[in-house]
């Protein structure tokens, strides 16, 4: 395995292990080729793409995340970036980048869940 792939695998595994604390079904996804669906599986209706590179190509990576969100037919896409100098022991300090549209969708889902809960009370 190339050094670049090793770095990617290390970062993806760190994110999956961290998210498993909340979502037990989370796992690192294997490569899917042209129809990739993100690096992390198991978060309902969400694609997570993980990047661990020295230079940041956020615009390019966001386009990749969006393509993978569409491939997965998911509502949400999240790009997770390991900042330079922040190791896997501090994965909770890594960056999650989303579009404003994704934030709006999250708010809509929260409001919908809140209304559903209110109707049950």
Name the predicted role of every residue range.
Residues 1-121:
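Catalytic phosphate/metal-binding cores of nucleic-acid and nucleotide-processing enzymes, i.e., regions
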């Amino acid at each position: 395995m190339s050094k670049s792939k090793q770095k990617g695998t290390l970062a993806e595994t760190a994110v999956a292990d961290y998210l498993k604390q909340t979502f037990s079904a989370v796992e690192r996804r294997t490569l899917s080729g042209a129809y990739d669906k993100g690096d992390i599986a198991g978060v309902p209706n969400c694609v997570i793409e993980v990047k661990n590179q020295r230079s940041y190509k956020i615009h390019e990576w966001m386009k990749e995340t969006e393509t993978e969100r569409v491939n997965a037919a998911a509502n949400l896409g999240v790009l997770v970036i390991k900042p330079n100098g922040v190791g896997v022991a501090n994965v909770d300090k890594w960056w999650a980048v989303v579009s404003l549209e994704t934030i709006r969708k999250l708010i809509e889902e929260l409001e919908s869940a809140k209304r559903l809960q209110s109707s049950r009370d």
